[in-house]
Structure formats: structure tokens, C-alpha cells
């Protein structure tokens, strides 16, 4: 049965909860997943609210957003507050030293903002090749300034606030300023990740901030203050985003990147000054009676999610319910989607991405016809999408890791789905004097430049944005009204996490908490991956009889989902992480 907390019980008496259809959870709640290392599960209750809601990766961040909404702020206002607090309390995942994608619904229009990091002007395709011409080892590339892309999060937050904000800019920054000055308690998750971290102590500023004099991670509950970050935020509050991209903060970023002792980068002040956020059309596609909308290239996430759903559209997923048959179809659909993603998707300023063709219902029906209900296809080949002529590219080997996600709905029905990142856990493992970690986003590019005699679409190029798997998603119902806001961190696994959750919400009609906590499953066009330590392990034998190469792996999703009902809002925060879904 679903565990319901005090808030739920108090609302039952008001007749609120009775109108919300719920399904019992299908699975146990065991141990958790990667690319950020797993730190265990925490039992969660379904979030319930009547006016507005925030689902985010840390209770302090969610509470900051909730308070902004209670003060009359918009979903965009709340997103600024949530992101800046996350920079403090979940520094391993996101922050102003990184980038983000935002999908915004204003009740009539869907807009996306691309705050993805960019390669410096000096970057070359061979950036991550060693002296022998072979790709560098991943962490040899990650640690240091070489992997740092020009951050986009601050520009994105300012752009969203200018376009959709209601409260003053200073007011939405204030919760993070107060927390940075007065301190916050180190959470078990942050402490656990610091304990597993191998490289962060090599940076003097990070070592002094996160570790004690003996080199041990500061203990759970230790109050951590960040006066340097507080000053950075006050500067941004007074002068806006320009103060990040020019002046002292910009110089601090450049110095930190270029002065790394063993792996310096080549970012310049001009790289920062020239950064712009791109407003792009949302990618929307049908699934059952719903419209699924999200971010287009340079993100591959929404294209791949819609490819998976387009294949599943041909099947009665509702009658399957969670089990080996559903996993077979979701995994085979994932193989097809990842095959296309690896070949076609990159920064649209550099590559003609055939978005219309890849998401065309006819094309997806033809891809679905390749699925044998009784046998896995193994490794799928890319398709040939219609409508757009595209250059022949080589497949990409880009590696992708962790992030954070927030879902927000305000009392006017506006919604934010925002996935935000510094890429790997703790990014490039370098901290600025301004109080924040820098990203290692450039390792999201392919390390190789040519495959099969063809240039790789996602290779490094000057000013280019690396391909992403982030899939912030907003779902509209058949009447074009807001129905759900969904997203997750998790590197390339994000695509499967979001697809699984959408099937749980839309086909199996699960409560968002239950949908988030479903075992993670799928394929990235390699093995069929089942989440270790969950009920999914029992499906391994049945899948192997269909020819699946099954791997049991940790899958550390951080799904945050909100569903709109006639009576209000219900939300879920993945039990694998420490987030919450709360509202007013």
C-alpha cells in the first residue's frame, strides 16, 4: 500500500485526496543506482497541494521554491531560488558553474531555453586525444580546466526571470544568500558522495570547504557556510548576470580554468562575455491522448524519449503492466532510439539534426515494425528518417553522467521542467574563489573525431554545445491543458528514466511517487539494464529466454514528477535521492 504522510491525511478530511486515483506500488524499495554513486533509498510520501508545488532534489531547495511561490512568485521565480540553493546543498550535481535546459509552459505556449555550456573558441576536435592519438582516459580528461565549458546557468536564470518572473530579482536570490551566510547542515547524501570521491581533495579550495583538517569529509550535520558564494550572489543580485560573464567573477573563472597545475584549459574572458542563451521551439509529439513536450537539440533527450514512446504507441502497454513483456518492448524501443541518437543528434548550429523525421509518427511506426515480440534484436542500427537530408556522420562515443532536476507548477498554472548540471559528480573538481565548482561538460563531446571514415557529429568544435541526454518534459492532456511535469538526472540513463516514468503515469495510471520509484529498466543499445536490488531482478530469466543480454546495474535516478488533477497537485520525489515534492 502507499504510505501517506500527515499532509495527505489532513487533506483527506477536506475531501481532496478522495478524488485522486492511485495505484498500489508494484515493487519493493531497495538499494539505488549511478552515475552519481548510490547512497541508498529513503521512504517518501506522495506530495499533495492545492495551489502550487515544487519537486526538487533537496528539501532546503524545495522549501526555498515553495516560499517564493507562497509570496506570489511564478514558476520561473521559484526555479531561480531552487537552483541557487541546490548550488549550496547539492554542489556535486549542479550550480552556476554549469548549464541547464528549461521547458516553460505559460498556459498557452511551450518555450524552451538552452543554457547548455559551450566549448571555448580555442577548442579543437582533438581536445581529448592523447599524444598517441587515442582517446584519453575519462578522468584524465575530466579533472582540471581542459573539460570546463563556458557556463550557461546564470544567463538562463536571468532570461527566464525577465520573461516570466513576477517578484524582484533580488528577492528570488535572497534564500540562497541567507543559506550561504548562515550555513546549512551537510546531508547524508553529500557526506556519502564526498566519502567516495577520489579527486576533489586535490583542489585546495574544495578541500578546505568540504573536508576537515585530517582530510575526512565533514560529518553529517556539520554546518557549512560559504561566504564567498554569498558575496557572488549579492553581486549578481545587484548587477545581474553581466557581473558573472564580465568583471571579477569572470576573471576568477578564467584564472581557475587556465591555471590548473596538470590539466589547464583555454577559456578566455571573451568566451564568457559572448555567451548567450538560446530560446528554441519545443519538440512536441503525441502519445495516446497526450502531448509530450520537451527540449530539442543539442539535447538528445526528448527526441529519444519520443522515439521510445512512438514505438510503444503501437502496443497496449496498459494491459502489460510492469513485467518482462513491458521491459522487452521498452528496451527494444530504447535500442532503436539510442541508435538514432548516437548518429544524428548534436548542436543544431553545427549539424542539421533531422528532428522532424526522427519524431515522425510514420517513421516511428516503421521502427516499431522492427521489434520482434519474442526475440531481442541485439544491437540496433540507425534508421533513415524522412523529410530532411542530413550529412552522413559517424557514431558518437560521448560519455555522460549526473545532474539534478526540478519540476514546478505555480498557482496560475505555469510550469517549469528544468534539468541542470555540472556533468560528473563535483564537475571538473575545481572550485573558484567565488565559491562554486566548475563543470566538466566538454567531456560530453565525443572523444574520437572520426568513425567509419566519417566525422562524428558530436565532436569538439569551437563555440559548440555538447550533446546532452537531459529530458525535461511537460505533458499536456487531450484538451491542451497541463497534465504533468517530469524529469530526472542520470546522464544517458535519463532517457530511460523519463520514458519509464511516463509509461507509469500515462499507461499504468500510477501515482507520481509510485511511478518515480518503479525499478529502472531499459537499453542504451547495449545490454538490457535492470536495476540491481529491485523486483526487476526476477525478470532476468524471462528476458534471457528472448535473447536479451541482461545486466543488473545500479541506476541512480532522481525523478521529480508533478501531476495536475481536478482537485489540485500530487507529486513524487525519487526515493533513491533526498528530494521532496511539497507545495502550498
Language model features by range: what are they?
Residues 11-23:
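Bacterial N-terminal signal peptides
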Amino acid at each position: 500500500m502507499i504510505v501517506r504522510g500527515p499532509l495527505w491525511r489532513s487533506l483527506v478530511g477536506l475531501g481532496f485526496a478522495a478524488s485522486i486515483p492511485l495505484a498500489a506500488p508494484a515493487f519493493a524499495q531497495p538499494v539505488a543506482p549511478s552515475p552519481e554513486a548510490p547512497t541508498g533509498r529513503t521512504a517518501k510520501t506522495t506530495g499533495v497541494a492545492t495551489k502550487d508545488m515544487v519537486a526538487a532534489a533537496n528539501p532546503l531547495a524545495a522549501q526555498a521554491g515553495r516560499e517564493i511561490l507562497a509570496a506570489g512568485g511564478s514558476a520561473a521565480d521559484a526555479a531561480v531560488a531552487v537552483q541557487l540553493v541546490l548550488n549550496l546543498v547539492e554542489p556535486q550535481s549542479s550550480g552556476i558553474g554549469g548549464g541547464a535546459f528549461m521547458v516553460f509552459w505559460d498556459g498557452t505556449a511551450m518555450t524552451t531555453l538552452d543554457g547548455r555550456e559551450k566549448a571555448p573558441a580555442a577548442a579543437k576536435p582533438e581536445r581529448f586525444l592523447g599524444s598517441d592519438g587515442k582517446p584519453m582516459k575519462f578522468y584524465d580528461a575530466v579533472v582540471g580546466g581542459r573539460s570546463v565549458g563556458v557556463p550557461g546557468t546564470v544567463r538562463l536564470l536571468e532570461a527566464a526571470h525577465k520573461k516570466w518572473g513576477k517578484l524582484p530579482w533580488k528577492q528570488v536570490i535572497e534564500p540562497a544568500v541567507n543559506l550561504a551566510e548562515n550555513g546549512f547542515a551537510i546531508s547524508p547524501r553529500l557526506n556519502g558522495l564526498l566519502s567516495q570521491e577520489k579527486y576533489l581533495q586535490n583542489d585546495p579550495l574544495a578541500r578546505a570547504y568540504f573536508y576537515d583538517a585530517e582530510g575526512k569529509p565533514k560529518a553529517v550535520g556539520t554546518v557549512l557556510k560559504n561566504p564567498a558564494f554569498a558575496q557572488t550572489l549579492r553581486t549578481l543580485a545587484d548587477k545581474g548576470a553581466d557581473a558573472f560573464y564580465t568583471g571579477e567573477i569572470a576573471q576568477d573563472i578564467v584564472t581557475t580554468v587556465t591555471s590548473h597545475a596538470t590539466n589547464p584549459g583555454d577559456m578566455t574572458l571573451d568566451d564568457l562575455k559572448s555567451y548567450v542563451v538560446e530560446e528554441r521551439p519545443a519538440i512536441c509529439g503525441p502519445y495516446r491522448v497526450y502531448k509530450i513536450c520537451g527540449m530539442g537539440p543539442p539535447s538528445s533527450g526528448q527526441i529519444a524519449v519520443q522515439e521510445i514512446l512512438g514505438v510503444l504507441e503501437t502496443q497496449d502497454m496498459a494491459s502489460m503492466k510492469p513485467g518482462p513483456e513491458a521491459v522487452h518492448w521498452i528496451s527494444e524501443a530504447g535500442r532503436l532510439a539510442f541508435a538514432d541518437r548516437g548518429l544524428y543528434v548534436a548542436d543544431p548550429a553545427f549539424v542539421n539534426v533531422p528532428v522532424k523525421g526522427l519524431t515522425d509518427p510514420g517513421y516511428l511506426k516503421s521502427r516499431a515494425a522492427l521489434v520482434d515480440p519474442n526475440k531481442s534484436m541485439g544491437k540496433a542500427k540507425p534508421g533513415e528518417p524522412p523529410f530532411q537530408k542530413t550529412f552522413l556522420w559517424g557514431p558518437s562515443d560521448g560519455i555522460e553522467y549526473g545532474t539534478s532536476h526540478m519540476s514546478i507548477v505555480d498557482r496560475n498554472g505555469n510550469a517549469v521542467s528544468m534539468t541542470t548540471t555540472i556533468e560528473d559528480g563535483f564537475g571538473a573538481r575545481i572550485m573558484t574563489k567565488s565559491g562554486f565548482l566548475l563543470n566538466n561538460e566538454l567531456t560530453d563531446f565525443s572523444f574520437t573525431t572520426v568513425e567509419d571514415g566519417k566525422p562524428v557529429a558530436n565532436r569538439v568544435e569551437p563555440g559548440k554545445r555538447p550533446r546532452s541526454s537531459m529530458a525535461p518534459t511537460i505533458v499536456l492532456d487531450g484538451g491542451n491543458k497541463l497534465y504533468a511535469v517530469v524529469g530526472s538526472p542520470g546522464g544517458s540513463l535519463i532517457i530511460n528514466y523519463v520514458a519509464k516514468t511516463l509509461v507509469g503515469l500515462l499507461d499504468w495510471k500510477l501515482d507520481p511517487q509510485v511511478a518515480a520509484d518503479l525499478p529502472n529498466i531499459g537499453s542504451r543499445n547495449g545490454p538490457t539494464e535492470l536495476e540491481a536490488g529491485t523486483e526487476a531482478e526476477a525478470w532476468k530469466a524471462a528476458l534471457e529466454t528472448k535473447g536479451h543480454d541482461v545486466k543488473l546495474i545500479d541506476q541512480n535516478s532522481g525523478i521529480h514528477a508533478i501531476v495536475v488533477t481536478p482537485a489540485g497537485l500530487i507529486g513524487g520525489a525519487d526515493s533513491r535521492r533526498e528530494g521532496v515534492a511539497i507545495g502550498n
